[in-house]
């Protein structure tokens, strides 16, 4: 089989196939010649739980992640728009590490390791390979790929083609599969050869001691304001990645599409970061921007024995770093389809079902971002949204992946109604959060909303480490639905207590209708112990 693209998605797909099919012939065609540089200029440095579990456990790379990359100190959110001081705004994050690790990955180091591992596993990795044409076979006919290398063109035949060509999107372009997400956002980003430590921005010992480890720099730090957020991601090579992601209508790209313009923009919206970059004399090692970076793909798996993974197919939004997650999910389905095909099974029904499942995961995750950038202007609504989104992610999608149930169609059928109920509740919660941010007064208290101090939240994260039998898995998915219902009721109850008219909002009514199985909640899910 041929994998088009030797980056993160392509190499992990090849390694996944090798682990499942040790005798299969696999070749990876990579346009770049030679090794990737450290701190390579790619988005996708921050992983979350599914991606980290996929790399570490599914592919067996945990020791490499621990030794060569940085354990992430979770996500951290500062409502710091137009503030000169980081320690006088709301902070949402953890004061200590939770049970399930995730990592800040230096893509150059990681992709070079993946390439070495692939070669040692008997996978042919061909560098300097430029794809000139793809002729897709149908029925049992082989696909043919024309590849230029060293001024010669070679035609390679393969039963399977897996497109992992990144934003080049070779198959998507060829087959006209592109579709809009309705999420018009832009991004600029650059890397600087210095460590950016937000702890250095404060002299307040009480603020510094909020966290057990003075390692806020290890977090994916989000500096947040109306219609935008800024990322700070550390890399093990000593660089720091800085990015601005913004709603296109609120913050036009032409105001930040060069390093000088980005610095001018930061001086207005995140002055403390701009000051830190100036004080460190931080010269960018690179700079890039993407207009309308979010996109979809109408089809990613085909009964004609081709598939698409990574950015060659879909890209949502980097706010919660889902890129590696969707590589993991797509690769899992692709590997199972290839395995079934090579075993002589009819894959058509599985292609249909896996496509529906992947589409469902993609669409439900998109709701976390689309139309939600206005929530960032409201610290209170933001803090609730973050908790809700985590609960939905850990309680539903993570459970499916960590329990190895993505391809267990029998079990997915048994929990179908609970999954649909959880998705419908999330679909109703996102408009409620949007309305809460738009129509209630914002407050930006000087507090740490410590997610690690919420016992149920800590337990939900820890639950990912516990392997379950069938009965236990069904119970877990049901418990996740009940937890989401309880959280929805508490979100509404707290808002109504502050303003009774919120009970009449259509968004409130719609959300509570989805949580109708629970008439009351104990009111403690959002009861943070506050650290000022």
What are these regions (language model features)?
Residues 1-9, 27:
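Beta1/beta-strand and adjacent pyrophosphate-binding region of the FAD-binding site
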Residues 9, 13, 34:
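Conserved Rossmann-like nucleotide-cofactor binding loop
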Residues 16, 36, 117-273, 331:
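Predominantly flavin-linked oxidoreductase catalytic cores and closely associated redox partners
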Residues 18-43:
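Glycine-rich FAD pyrophosphate-binding loop
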Residues 50, 95-116, 252-257:
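Short beta-strand to alpha-helix junction loop
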Residues 226-230, 234-236, 250-337, 341-373:
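FAD/FMN-dependent oxidoreductases across multiple families
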Residues 338-532:
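C-terminal helical "tail/cap" subdomain of flavin- and related membrane-associated enzymes
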